[in-house]
Amino acid sequence: MIRYRLWVWVLCLVFPTWVWAENETRTCTSFTQQGRQVTFHLADSAALQLQLCSSSVVKIWFSPDGQLQRRNASFAVINEELEEVGTIHVDEQAACYEIFTPKLRIRVNKSPMSLQIFDKYQKLLFSDYADKGHVSEGTKKVEYKVLRRDEHFFGLGEKAGKMDRRGESYKMWNSDKPCYSVVEDPLYKSIPFFMSNYRYGIFLDNTYKTEFKFGTESRDYFEAPNGEMVYYFIFGKDYKEIISQYVGLTGKPIMPPKWALGFAQCRGLLTSEKLSREIAEGYRKRGIPCDIIYQDIGWTEYLQDFEWRKGNYENPKKMLSDLKEMGFKVVVSQDPVIAQANKKQWEEADRLGYFVKDNTNGKSYDMPWPWGGNCGVVDFTLPAVADWWGTYQQKPIDDGISGFWTDMGEPAWSNEEQTERLVMKHHLGMHDEIHNVYGLTWDKVVKEQFEKRNPDRRVFQMTRAAYAGLQRYTFGWTGDSGNGDDVLQGWGQLANQIPVMLSAGLGLIPFSSCDITGYCGDIEDYPAMAELYTRWIQFGAFNPLSRIHHEGDNPVEPWLFGPEAEKNAKAAIELKYRLLPYIYTYAREAYDTGLPIMRPLFLEYPMDMETFSTDAQFLFGRELLVAPVVKKGARTKNVYLPEGTWIDYNNKQTVYTGEQWTTVDAPLSSIPMFVKQGSIIPTMPVMNYTHEKPVYPLTFEVFPAQEGAQAAFTLYEDEGEDLGYQRDEFVKTPIICSTLANGYELTVSAREGKGYTVPGPRNLLFRIYSAKAPKEITVKGKKIKKTKPERLEEDLENDTETVAWSWDKETGVCSVRIPDKGIDEKLMITFK
């Protein structure tokens, strides 16, 4: 017999403990219907409203007073009509009401009133717990749901600890947690969306402080101190389909400029022209790729005047121009406050009523800030603030910066114990309601003002604090991660950042970075940190946005940790730059579908329960599996490989059978990495920065499938910095390699799309990891010449006429070189 336990969402703010109410058994007496909405009326005047957003998404609203009213429209949901649902028929029976869709059976039991949702095969997916499904006391609301013995949960955005949430509890309250530990909660963002292996997701759309408990107590619950109990039940055949429906509700992620996918350098006191130039020259002198140099908070004269600090920057415009010539973009921080020391701007904002108010006296709230003295907190929920902030924000853009790092938006120094800030009154409500969306409202203003004043240019904004829906405006990073008592103890935080970032990706933060090196701790012994630094960089190379950052005046450039660390760091960074065509294609997929580039194994292998506990590795796209080394002194790594055949990507030769754990070598010089048999990986030459050469050859690494199967990849390309990707101004090139009994058929289809022209002419080089020597190769039925391997790649960048092939018997690689004409090409590779 299966024993059922409970999971709960808890929204707790005013009352620290729950007091049981004795009269919570509810009876449903009738229903009314209007369009997509069916409202069930209860004997105690409460109401349960179901709204069909689609055949698989149901909005559920429990209202104890039956009013079904919200103070504010949703900050996260932008579309509740995901598809036509036709006429909704409610089937009334003696004990229940039932609604059927093509995918779901929804049952509302009359007495005691409870909600159950089944799939079309009558499998129970989601159920209230008996007569305690919906409990309320005053403004506080609690939901109890049945938990199966084999049920697991994933999501809730950026959270520390293991990815499988079962047996844990989590709070939603954006908190500034400097040097947070590997078990810290809550953190900076609130994404109240999770998924169950029972093929459903839940998005709780309540911005107050909430708490989720997944089987932590004998009777578990989810609870809200205020606001409405509104949540969305999202059914899908797998996690990908659930995420797709969540995207439909909350919006697509924006796509970053291509340069944002390169490497970035920062540190806490990187706040001067001199230091910026030194770092830029250091990277270029050593040939280590880098695209971005950040300026931390001290770049401004005052918070937040957007003026370059006098004495630190002799000529900011010339500095930015010179760095641009070297291939660097500059991103600067901004905080959401105006320092009182910034007298002119503070008085202007105070006079205009642009600050959050103190509800006890009606004056601008006086906020102590970590630096810069006391500040006024800008009220981004007030519409008039947007243009005012945008005018100031535009000044450094006009000087030549390329983006913003929106920091401290919790707002800073906020944590769940600090109730004194609840007196803050925003235009759209009191702080207990607005706190979790404060950063989101700021991010929205930054993005929309950037696009308004810089037409057809992609925004780059990386934020720390946000709420569900942030993907429409910004990218993320995981905040000020701690390293324990000593920076050399940072191995635990390095390991922790893997599940933190994977979970962030499931919450529609597909483009993010951690602070590579871990944020906290003074570095006193650079040689002693060399190994840890190397492993941080190796992991960081697979962050979608890769930023090296550390607190204070602790330099963390690769050349400071010794020759071996520099060499290994450079190799890891170069690997990312080689993979940019692959990464950029997946950036487009993230825009289209919401799926993260860096993804947990269960996203691709949902039926393999072994993947539920693989927190120390991840997929990078579908084809690559990465297993960072996160233990001091380790030179091996225990890796789980899911179904299929996997090949060591570092040597391109060692083959592993999937659905098992295996221990692999992990020298300090490389990161364990695998490619699935039947994959095609597009690569490019390593450059100092992403746009160093507008025209370059593309290399496709082909790992053929088994006989009778195919390897395939569709390459995505666009301009890289404008908004053409939203106007379908891009091209795609489908490539298929079919494995035959006597060879391979490699098909390059004509480019698909319009509005963008690929720079050219250029070459395409195919490296086929075959292990079988070809007899001949034909292109469109015509034999092409064979040459030596070392000759095949001569002058690849300039000679776009040569068609040839080679065979390297030492490596088992067959290489074919053809010009890229954008037309159909068919290559036949016949074995001896």
List each model region and its residues.
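Bacterial Sec-dependent N-terminal signal peptides
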Residues: 1-25
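Generic signature of intrinsically disordered, low-complexity, basic-rich segments
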Residues: 17, 54, 509-510
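N-terminal accessory segment at the very beginning of proteins
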Residues: 20-259, 266-268, 272-275, 280-281, ...
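Catalytic-domain carbohydrate-binding cleft regions of carbohydrate-active enzymes
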Residues: 122-670, 675-676
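Positively charged interface segments
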Residues: 655, 663-665, 791-796, 802
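Aromatic sugar-binding surface patches on proteins
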Residues: 810-814
